[in-house]
Amino acid sequence: GVGFKAGVKDYKLTYYTPEYQTLDTDILAAFRVTPQPGVPPEEAGTAVAAESSTGTWTTVWTDGLTSLDRYKGRCYHIEPVSGEENQFIVYVAYPLDLFEEGSVTNMFTSIVGNVFGFKALRALRLEDLRIPPAYSKTFQGPPHGIQVERDKLNKYGRPLLGCTIKPKLGLSAKNYGRAVYECLRGGLDFTKDDENVNSQPFMRWRDRFLFCAEALYKAQAETGEIKGHYLNATAGTCEEMIKRAVFARELGVPIVMHDYLTGGFTANTSLAHYCRDNGLLLHIHRAMHAVIDRQKNHGIDFRVLAKALRMSGGDHIHSGTVVGKLEGERDITLGFVVLLRDDFIEKDRSRGIYFTQPWVSLPGVLPVASGGIHVWHMPALTEIFGDDSVLQFGGGTLGHPWGNPPGAAANRVALEACVQARNHGQDLAREGNDVIRRASKWSPELSSACEVWKEIKLYFEAMDTL
C-alpha cells in the first residue's frame, strides 16, 4: 500500500493545539469566527489555522517531505464573544518562516488570502495581528515619521491643519491651484488632493502639480511658514506612480500622496522607499477601507490595515474623526491612533487591541482626522488626538461664507485658541465651546464660521462597535 494514510483530514487533530506556548517570533492573529450552524467552534477555528498556513483539504503524500510541525499555523485559544450568539474569537499562531520578509502583500495573501471563502464559516473577520519585532524589522516603515516631519516643517507643539480641495472633480488646474494658494495663505499647513484626483481629462496631473507648486511657494513667501500640498501620485501602473513622485521631487515640494488600498501594498511600499530616499513625506489615504472593515462580523478590522500601513510605509494616514460625518467610534478610533503613533502598545480590549504590540524603532505615523468636521469640533479634536495629528477641514474651510482664506484663518485661530487654553490647564472637553466663543470675539473670520456651523450635527450610531 501507499506509505501514508490517504483521505479527507480532520483539521482538529493537527491544527488545534490549546497547550501551545506562543513564541516571540510568531505572528499572532485574532479572528472573529461565525461558524455555519452545526459546525463546532474548534472545527471552524482549526479550519482557519490550516487553510491560512500549510493545510489543504486532503492528505497529500508531499506532506511527508516537510516538517508540518515546524510550518503549520496553530489554533491555540478559542473564546466565545460575549453578547453574540455563535461567534468566537479564534487565536492563531503562525511561524515566522511562512512569510516573505518585507512584504505586506505576502503576509496578507497568506493570512487572509483564501480562508474567507471557506464553506464551514458563515463569516470571518480578522480583528488584530501581533507583528513580532523579528518581522517588523524587515520593513522600512514610514519614510520619515513624526519627529522628522516636524523638523522638516518647523512646526511644533500643535496639531497640523489641512484642507481637501473641493469640488473634488471638475476644477481646472489653474483654479485648483488658486484654491490651494488661498487656503495656505489663510493659515493652513497643508492642502490635499482628493483621493480620486489622479489625472483626468479636465485636469492632467502634470498641470496640477505645476500650479500647486506655484501656489505653495507663493503662500510660503508671504507667510514665512513652510507649506505643503499632498500631490496625489496614485496611478494606473507603478511606473507611472513613481514618475509622478519624481516630478514632485523635481519641483521641490515637501509631500506626495497615495491611496494605499486601491493602489495596493506592493505599489505603496515601492513609493515609501522612493520617498525616504528622496526626502519626500508621504500622505496616505485609505479609500476603499470601509469595503473591507465596516461589517462587524466579516472582513478585516481597520486596526490591522493601519498596522500594515505602518509596515508598508506612510507618514500620515486617515484614521476617522470620532466627531464628523464618517464612521468612527471613540475608543476604537483611539486604538488606531495609538497603534499608529506609539512605540509600544499594551493589549487593551476596551479599544479592540487584542495583543501587546512592540514596534521597536519603526517610525510613527500621524493620524489624520478628516470628514465633516468644522470649527466647533476643534476642542474635541485637540483633546482626542493631541498634538501629533493632522486635522483636515475640507468643507469646513472652503464652505466659509467669506471664501477660502477666511475659512482657513478661522480654523487656524480656533486651533491656536484650543492649544493655548489646553496649555493653560483648561479642560477642553468641558470648556471647549467657551474657548471657541472667546476666540471668535477677536476674530471676525472665526465668528462668521461659528455662526454658519453652529447647528450642524452629523450623528448616527457607529456600525463597528466593540
UniProtKB/Swiss-Prot annotation:
E.C. numbers: 4.1.1.39
Pfam families tied to this protein: RuBisCO_large, RuBisCO_large_N
Keyword vocabulary terms for this entry: Calvin cycle, Carbon dioxide fixation, Chloroplast, Disulfide bond, Lyase, Magnesium, Metal-binding, Methylation, Monooxygenase, Oxidoreductase, Photorespiration, Photosynthesis, Plastid
Site for Transition state stabilizer, residues: K325
Subcellular location as annotated: Plastid, Chloroplast
UniProt xrefs under InterPro entries: RuBisCO, RuBisCo_large_chain_AS, RuBisCO_lsu_C, RuBisCO_lsu_C_sf, RuBisCO_lsu_fd_N, RuBisCO_lsu_N_sf, RuBisCO_lsuI
Catalytic activities: 2 (2R)-3-phosphoglycerate + 2 H(+) = D-ribulose 1,5-bisphosphate + CO2 + H2O; D-ribulose 1,5-bisphosphate + O2 = 2-phosphoglycolate + (2R)-3-phosphoglycerate + 2 H(+)
Textual note on the cofactor: Binds 1 Mg(2+) ion per subunit.
Positions carrying N6,N6,N6-trimethyllysine: K5
Processing and modification events after translation: The disulfide bond which can form in the large chain dimeric partners within the hexadecamer appears to be associated with oxidative stress and protein turnover.
Enzyme class of the recorded protein, top EC level: lyase
UniProt-annotated binding residues for Mg(2+): K192, D194, E195
Residues at the active site: K166, H285
Family per similarity comment: Belongs to the RuBisCO large chain family. Type I subfamily.
PANTHER family named among the record's database cross-references: RIBULOSE BISPHOSPHATE CARBOXYLASE, RIBULOSE BISPHOSPHATE CARBOXYLASE LARGE CHAIN
Assembly description: Heterohexadecamer of 8 large chains and 8 small chains; disulfide-linked. The disulfide link is formed within the large subunit homodimers.
Protein name: Ribulose bisphosphate carboxylase large chain
Lineage of producing organism: Eukaryota, Viridiplantae, Streptophyta, Embryophyta, Tracheophyta
